[in-house]
Amino acid sequence: MSVFIDKNTKVMVQGITGSTALFHTKQMLDYGTQIVAGVTPGKGGQVVEGVPVYNTVEEAKNETGANVSVVYVPAPFAADSIIEAADADLDMVICITEHIPVVDMVKVKRYLQGRKTRLVGPNCPGVITADECKIGIMPGYIHKKGHVGVVSRSGTLTYEAVHQLTEEGIGQTTAVGIGGDPVNGTNFIDVLKAFNEDSETKAVVMIGEIGGTAEEEAAQWIKENMNKPVIGFIGGQTAPPGKRMGHAGAIISGGKGTASEKIKTLNDCGVETADTPSEIGTTLIDAAKKAGIYEELLTIKK
């Protein structure tokens, strides 16, 4: 089992003819992802990297059976691309694009209410199910199949955590980057719920950062519902209030959203936290040993 995507997922790339999308389309194909279509208005009929290009999402879906899209469309047009994917009733749309105006995302979020399409992102690295399907911009080679789920607001910290796990012989089920913007689609609790219900996932790494209250809400949900060990890391422990730290959503405002608040809430709810990014792997190992599942997690033969 896996979460959200697997080897049977059929993917379309929105904005496929752009340079960034072309580069990552090749990377995804090399990983083994089934990319069956691309969409760029006005470029229908072209073929790039062996992938047919269509003018609309609807046409691409009808012709190829694609059920998930990944958006590499520039920020001014990305919201419309997400809405187009929702109108075509795709199962999921993963938006990589950064710098989408907050007001655009508020409209998108409202538009998606009551629809079946799940949005992951924006401003995220994507979703990868190890050794099966990679949708996004993450380095594929560090991900190896196993039993640990990863959910994160940060792209590079996801890669750091996954690399540490792999180096320790611990494989992963799925890694989900939910993005660093203040208004996004899928949240921590959505992913934790999916991991909790997934029989292959035995433990979870959750990576948050300053700003907002998503981590505190997730901590409470973990305390009340989670039946698997979860460890956490919060980025931005030295951030001054009022200064945006990289991501649009990573800002301490009105005294809320500090790293220390988040870490305290996680710890109070039974989630062990790593003090530094380099300790994420060892923190997970400690939690796994306490839960008696460490041996089960050693899925990578060295």
From Swiss-Prot:
Associated pathway: Carbohydrate metabolism; tricarboxylic acid cycle; succinate from succinyl-CoA (ligase route): step 1/1
Swiss-Prot/TrEMBL keywords: Ligase, Nucleotide-binding, Tricarboxylic acid cycle
GO CC terms, sorted: cytosol; succinate-CoA ligase complex (ADP-forming)
Binding site for CoA: T17, G18, S19, T20, K43, I96, T97, E98
List of catalytic residues: H247
Gene Ontology BP annotations: tricarboxylic acid cycle
Domain of life: Bacteria
Protein family per UniProt: Belongs to the succinate/malate CoA ligase alpha subunit family.
Subunit structure: Heterotetramer of two alpha and two beta subunits.
UniProt function note: Succinyl-CoA synthetase functions in the citric acid cycle (TCA), coupling the hydrolysis of succinyl-CoA to the synthesis of either ATP or GTP and thus represents the only step of substrate-level phosphorylation in the TCA. The alpha subunit of the enzyme binds the substrates coenzyme A and phosphate, while succinate binding and nucleotide specificity is provided by the beta subunit.
Protein name per the record: Succinate--CoA ligase [ADP-forming] subunit alpha
UniProt organism field: Staphylococcus epidermidis (strain ATCC 12228 / FDA PCI 1200)
